Structure formats: C-alpha cells, structure tokens
C-alpha cells in the first residue's frame, strides 16, 4: 500500500483523498474493513455506511465489523479479517470509548498491525503513544499504533493552548481540521489541507 496510515479530519476529507489517483493508485479492488467502534454512542450502522461511501467508486470490497464493546475483542473472525484486510478504517466518534475497547486486546493488536490504517476525525488521537483527552485537552496514554506525532482535532483556543503547555517542547502536535489530512509512509508524516503542526509554541512543517 502507498501509505501506512491516513488521518482525515472528516469523511469529506476522506472523499478527497480517495479521489487522489496518484496517492491511491492501487486502491482498486482492495479489501476494506471498517471498524465503527467509536460511534457506539450514536449509531455503528450509520457510521459504517458513511465510512464505506468514499470507497464505493474504487471497486473495493467493504465489510464492517460491528465491534461495540469488549465482549467481542477476542472474536477470531474479527481478528482474522483485520489482519488480512488491505485497508482498515476507524470511524469518527468517541476516542476514549475506542481506546477502552481496543486496548490490550487481540482486536486492538490486529488494528495496530493493519497494512494501511485510516482514522477519521477524533478517533485519530488514539493512534500515537500519547493521545489528547477531549474532555480537557490533557495528554494521556494512546495505543501506539502509529507514532511520531500527537494528533488531535480542532478544539477551542483555550483548550488547545492548555494542550500545548502540557506537552514537552520536543513533541510535535498536529491539529487536524475538518478538511485536513495526514499521510504516513512508515517513516515520515506529511500534512495537507487544514492541519497545523507545532513543536512547543512554534509552528513547524511536516515533511
């Protein structure tokens, strides 16, 4: 796969990235698995359908795993499908709920080992070793699926300032807006659209 991880601020941004012929030239006739765990407090079904839509024009085979809570985190079929999929998509929703379900579980390990991991919206914060608690902006423990950045979505300025003040000065924080995207090839993160990256108080460029 051309990327190891794709973070998008919204489904609209995912649509745009999926239409990028150069970046995703191999995203045809691929096996896509959607994990809508983060949408457990709204609708897993609606989230799954919404996440599948951007892949509909790419001749992808799409399956959704309705993983709502920890009762199925050791399900052998779920684990197998996550490991064999070309692309695993994590829906937007509650990052804290997603973390609590996936942490220290066979399903969580399979998500982390995905060939290409796509995270939509707030759920992207769980990807790194450090995530941002959406309730107040404090750094906390992430799942370590993809590292090198601390990722969060757009928040009120006061909360964002608090987040930056609590991170070490050598840590890069990427704030992904609704039209923003981050691509990771396993070595380097690259930003496009509405993304602001900072190290301490300074704005930095990702490349």
Residue ranges and their predicted role:
Residues 1-28, 38-49, 137-207:
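C-terminal and late-domain segments of enzyme folds
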Residues 31, 116-117, 172:
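Proline-centered loop/turn at the N-terminus of a beta-strand
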Residues 32, 88, 121, 182:
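A residue-level signal for conserved active-site and pocket-lining positions in enzyme catalytic cores
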Residues 33-35, 39-93, 97:
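Portal/gating segments that form or line small-molecule/metal binding sites
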Residues 52, 78-79, 104-111, 163-164:
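Short amphipathic alpha-helical segments and helix-helix/interface helices
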Residues 59, 85, 114, 146-147, ...:
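Short, well-ordered alpha-helix to beta-strand connector turns
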Residues 91-158:
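Class I SAM-dependent methyltransferase SAM-binding "motif I" and its flanking Rossmann-like core
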